[in-house]
Amino acid sequence: MATGKIIQVIGAVVDVEFPQDAVPKVYDALEVENGAEKLVLEVQQQLGGGIVRCIAMGSSDGLRRGLNVNNLGHPIEVPVGKATLGRIMNVLGDPIDMKGDIGEEERWAIHRSAPSYEELSNSQELLETGIKVIDLMCPFAKGGKVGLFGGAGVGKTVNMMELIRNIAIEHSGYSVFAGVGERTREGNDFYHEMTDSNVIDKVSLVYGQMNEPPGNRLRVALTGLTMAEKFRDEGRDVLLFVDNIYRYTLAGTEVSALLGRMPSAVGYQPTLAEEMGVLQERITSTKTGSITSVQAVYVPADDLTDPSPATTFAHLDATVVLSRQIASLGIYPAVDPLDSTSRQLDPLVVGQEHYDVARGVQSILQRYQELKDIIAILGMDELSEEDKLVVSRARKIQRFLSQPFFVAEVFTGSPGKYVSLKDTIRGFKGIMEGEYDHLPEQAFYMVGSIDEVVEKAKKL
C-alpha cells in the first residue's frame, strides 16, 4: 500500500504526490491520516510526475500540506445486501442513523460497468401507481426509467414520496432511496414517513445532503445504485428513487472547474452528457432482475431546455412534467397532461381502450387551451354549443386529474386515495362520453374514483 503526501488543497480538490512507481489508478480511493477523522479522497486525474488530483468525499477543513495519504488500492466500496435495509448511510456506506454497524457480508465498488447487451431484458409490463393522472397519461413500465420534472416548489418530492408509499406498499419488493443534494429536513421527514407506513425494513436510504461537499454529492447516487444493482443481481425487482438528479449534475459542475476543465454551455462541465450516461446506463434491467427508477429532476428557472434537464430527457421511458401554472390553480398533483409523455402509451402495450381514453382526454384539454384566449376576450357566450360542451368537460377533467395524497394528509386534511387503473379509465371515459355532464364541476375536485364524484355531488 503506497503512501503519498498532500501538496495542494483547493476547496474540495486535493493534489497528492506519490512515488513515480506507485501512482494510484483513476477512481482509486485514498485515505488521509488526519487524527481521528477518516477522510477519503477519490483520484480523478493523473497530472504526471507522480501527482494525482483527487476529490474529497468529506470536508477538506483541517487538511494541510505534508499530511500522509494511503492508497487503498481499490475504488470506494460500500455495503450491499439485506443488511442495508432499514438503514441510513452516507456516500461511503457508513451508517449515519446511530444504530451501530451495518454488519454487511459483502462490499461492492461503486464504479462498475453497465450490463452488456446480451444481459439486458425488455419488459412491457405496466406498474400501477394509484395516481390517476400518471396511470392514465404517462404510465410507468416495470423496469423502466421515469423522470419527475419541475421547478422549485411544484411538488417533486411530495409526488415521489407518494409514489414510494403506493408502490412500496402495493409492490412487495425492495427499494433504494438516494438523497442527492436535497434538504436534510426532507430526508428526516422521509425516514419517519417510511417508519410510520411500516415499509422502512424494505428500504435502504443513502443520503448526501445539501450541506455536504460536492465530491460527496457527486458519488452518492452511485452508492445507492450499487446497492440496487446487488438486489437486482439476486433476482429481485428493485425500485430506485433518486432525489434529485440535477444536484448530481451540479456537484459535477462544482468540481469540474477546480479540476481545471473548461466550462461548456451555461457553465456546465464539458463531460455533462458522459457523466449522465455513465449513471443512467447502469440503471437498467437484466434477465435476472429489474430496476425501476424514479428520478426527480429540478428544472432551473422552469426552463426545460436547460442543458441539465435536456440531457436527462434522452435517458427516460416516461416523463412526468409538473407545471407551475397547474399548481397555481390549486390542482395537485400538478402534472401537465399535455407535456407528460410515456413510451408505454401505445395501444399494443396498454390496450386500445386505455390509449383512446388518454388521447381523448388530451384532445379535449388541448381544445380548451386553444379556446382560453377567446373566452378571455369575448366570454363563454360567444362559443358554439359544441365548444361550450368541450369547455365544460375539460374543466371537469382538469379537476378530476387532482387527487388527495396519503403523504399530504397532514396538509390537506382529507384522506389519501389509491385509484386502480380500471377505475381511472372508467371515470375519464364517462366524463368524455357525457355521462356526468349534469354534475357540478366542483364535485370532481380532490376525489378518488368517479363513484366519489357522484356521492360528493349529492351533498353539494
UniProtKB/Swiss-Prot annotation:
It comes from the Bacteria. The gene is atpD. It comes from Pectobacterium atrosepticum (strain SCRI 1043 / ATCC BAA-672). It is a peripheral membrane protein. It is an enzyme of class 7 (translocase). This is ATP synthase subunit beta. Its main location: membrane. It is found in: Cell inner membrane. Keywords: ATP synthesis, ATP-binding, Cell inner membrane, Cell membrane, CF(1), Hydrogen ion transport, Ion transport, Membrane, Nucleotide-binding, Translocase, Transport. Its EC number is 7.1.2.2. ATP binds at G150, G151, A152, G153, V154, G155, K156, T157. Belongs to the ATPase alpha/beta chains family. Produces ATP from ADP in the presence of a proton gradient across the membrane. The catalytic sites are hosted primarily by the beta subunits. It holds the Pfam family ATP-synt_ab. SMART domains: AAA (SM00382). It catalyses: ATP + H2O + 4 H(+)(in) = ADP + phosphate + 5 H(+)(out). Gene3D superfamilies: 2.40.10.170, Bovine Mitochondrial F1-atpase, Atp Synthase Beta Chain, Chain D, domain 3, P-loop containing nucleotide triphosphate hydrolases. F-type ATPases have 2 components, CF(1) - the catalytic core - and CF(0) - the membrane proton channel. CF(1) has five subunits: alpha(3), beta(3), gamma(1), delta(1), epsilon(1). CF(0) has three main subunits: a(1), b(2) and c(9-12). The alpha and beta chains form an alternating ring which encloses part of the gamma chain. CF(1) is attached to CF(0) by a central stalk formed by the gamma and epsilon chains, while a peripheral stalk is formed by the delta and b chains.
